[in-house]
């Protein structure tokens, strides 16, 4: 199963087919052409998918079709962004706002900003993976990506996630580069993550 976007092959579960479970067959529609049942543990590996309408791509595997995957990263097991970074409604100075666990008002992510942030964190994960980042560092970036994915829909405190997971530090370590004017900046740093940008190559 592949859910888009995903942080790496550690978020691609490969299922074992079992068509003999009477309990499971009783749940599925007998008229369905194809149907797959999964449990919450499998959904968790799908970059934090839940059962409220998330979609995945099903790829049948055989001797000619082989999908590479890895075991889930330890730091992602049991992590639920909707619990870790939830917010609540509160009336402050006559206005209804969202506050985090510390009671501090937070700004909720818009749909457009979510797309931008997903691009940023996806590029970061790509650059880190290609640079051979440690599993613990990848866990931080992927945890933040899981928060960003659900931030708009579930009104999560993505700013706190950015701090807790040290995203600025990871950007500096894996994406710091100098442009042709000698100015340093962070952002997509490899050919894969910069594929949609115009890159100037200095003459030698």
Predicted regions and their residues:
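Core mixed alpha/beta domains of very large multi-subunit molecular machines
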Residues: 1-59, 63-76, 191-204
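C-terminal catalytic or substrate-handling cores of phosphate/nucleotide-
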Residues: 53, 63, 69-204
